[in-house]
Amino acid sequence: MATDEMKSETKKTEHKQKQSTQIKQDLPPPTIPPLPLPYKSCTLKVSIHCEGCKRKVKKILTSIEGVFKVDIDVKQHKVTVIGIISPEILLKKLNKAGKNAEQLPEIPDPVDNKPKPVDPKEKNKKKKKEEKVQITNEATSSGIDNPEKPGSGECDKPESEKPVDEKCLSGDGGETSGPVKEEKKDVLKEKDSGKEESPSPPADSSAPAAEKKAEDTGGAVPDNGKVGKKKKKKGQSLATTNNPTDGPARTQSLPPPTATDYDRPINQINDHHITTTNNPPRHDLYPYPAQGYYAPQVMYGVSYNVAQPPVSVDAASYYTPPPPYSYAYMHNGYQPSDQNPCQPRPSDSFELFSDENPNGCAIM
């Protein structure tokens, strides 16, 4: 019985194999898909006025080998050609047929120009790469800018890690740094003491400026309280400059010059100023004549004669009076020095209007 069952099973399997082989033979062989042709589309601008022009252009383009399809737009004068051919050949054929044609620039498809979506994984990878590059650049730059000095690592270690016998914490270092600090302190003290001892320059310059103005204008020095106070405060400095001897220093303000001081030279106006000047002596605009001499004044007079009238009415006789007497002139002021020959101005104006003075006013 067992042998019969085994025989039946083997027969069934053989039958199944035969059926499968028959099915395979009945199926058609697999077909290979054709390769896509390299078609190109180009747009041309052609002058098309009517349906006849349209037919003529289409006939010319379809007759060329490699042209697959031709589309014509009459309103826009536009022709699109699809095929395996260069646009230069198409333009030559149309120009020979008498049709003006130009090639238009290709408009890119919006679908092709869309940006591709970027995966977040790629973004993370790029960021990590950039961070690594920055870290390496910083490390290289810090190594170049701050090179390690020999022996600096030992001093930079914390106190717990440093050995006891290091030079950074030894007593020798304290001895070397001690005198340097002391020298700096001495220099700072000298600078502070120099600032305290130095007098203020604007206060000293105010007094000579006022005296220079008085000398230039020829007037009296204004008796201001401010100038006097400043001079009193700076009495020691004036005593050292104006009094070369060991005598007492003058701290009082200078009195204003009088009228007689103008005739004296600059060296004698004030006893406080001993310095000599090389400037020429000062003269008045109208110098006075020498003492005891008066220039004769020319007198103008008209002679009127009734018996014998003059030839011309405008004729006039001119005569000069005799030289006047010399009058002694006394002046209580200082005698003029040899350096200034000019005479002082008369203090009293009574003599100018006296009858004895020929230079006086005749009306008075």
Swiss-Prot record:
Residue(s) carrying Cysteine methyl ester: C361
A Pfam family matched in the record: HMA
Comp. bias regions, Basic and acidic residues: 1-12, 111-122, 154-169, 180-198
A GO molecular-function descriptor: metal ion binding
Stretches assigned to the HMA domain: 39-102
Propeptide position ranges: 362-364
Region: Disordered, residue numbers: 1-33, 101-265
Keywords assigned by UniProt, alphabetized: Lipoprotein, Metal-binding, Methylation, Prenylation
Positions that bind a metal cation: C50, C53
Xref: InterPro entries: HMA_dom (IPR006121), HMA_dom_sf (IPR036163)
Residues bearing a lipid moiety (S-farnesyl cysteine): C361
UniProt function note: Heavy-metal-binding protein.
Protein name: Heavy metal-associated isoprenylated plant protein 35
